[in-house]
């Protein structure tokens, strides 16, 4: 089960992200929307439209803090760093790092020809002794720490265990265990300070000066033609790569060099096939990328989007890929993608890996997983027919769409107010459903109607009026969550028994979307008409629940205690109008009083002498107030 994860990329869509969130958390969108808990932090290029938490529940799409100071041309790196917990084994954790050449979109899954690389690491309770994988995790954490400093993280830092703050801290602590001897150099590369090509060359030099006889290069996007000294318009970057590799003695003078393209969109390559093939410095053969039949099935066509460099010697007897190395990542074979470090004018933020794989073969062997044409899209034909090649449509970075608002979220109060977490955040209007500014109060705004999941805010930046949606955190700390229905004690226990997970989605739940502005039918407190329930039956039901709660919470880990208290308060709040609670109000008894006994609490929270104990007692007090039993005699004192 996913604890927390960070994702960065150029673009993403709701279809992909919802699938990813469901696989990560194991919960469907409706369950995540009801939980209102942030489990994934998403950072995309600011040119991309915002993915709202009502559309991708459990995911916070973070905006850049200051567009004018972004230290890259494009946020193009495609990396995910994920932390998982084993719900069945305390202290058993798992880290996963994914580096992709594709965007986080349905197009990547269904149409593109892309590559991905991943590494997994167990943390139980100490991290596995894999120095290189530990170094990769630390490198990824450094990249995301740098990105988070540039983004608006106030929502993740909100004072609720459901904001993602505590879960992110847990995963950070797991990754911190990776920082120990022996240490190794990470395979993960990024362009915060150096270009990808510079880092690739440096890595090859450290590995040793072995000249390889084959080089395969592929990219989903190439740059426009540049006029060379001889007057011929031809792309120069492929030859720059070859020249750098030869100069570092990583490529032999007469090596075979193949350049893989999407024939329908290969930019300057489309008009330069002969120039590349006949180049006096080093011939480069242009070939079509091919989707491996072992992966996609025979005859399945996909468009190349992957970016890769693969080089090795080839055994004349076995066909083995000797002295092999592989780069794959987000950096296209362009100046901004491969040659430059990140900068606002000339370099993208890119990420990739440099790997030295063993056991691969140029020949189709008995083990399909070792045949290089099953691993890389390099099985296509040589392209000599210039009319069949197309440059594709030109592309330029779109204008920014996702910008940080002066306020990152609002907090709902029971009296119909939306309060601002930071009263000094500047002049901001909150617009109601009709687009009319809400009345301003001392600490926020007056909202007419039931609690919204999101609200639209308006402010002025310079001379420009801006609009953005911001989430609303409800009284239970849930972020942009769907309304809570009234439940009975059995359903309350179902929610508690599933902790730290979520209860199964019941039939009929999740059909339709209550939307951003739910109506009173969905949000108003509901007092169910009590069925005939005798005091004895109510006491038996309640005592069973109290015993179940005690057994459950005495086994909760200290790191999960705040989240448990939040779940306890939410579930019992939802049950405040059920017949059993109504019966206790009529009997003027407080049924929650036994939960204060030390035997019903874990050791670290058995009394008010600890912060955990005080937090628990405050939670019980709020539940008693919601149940209206706070002034009544304790249940255990009943004669």
Task: Give the positions of each predicted feature.
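Terminal interaction modules at protein C-ends
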Residues: 1-327, 332-639
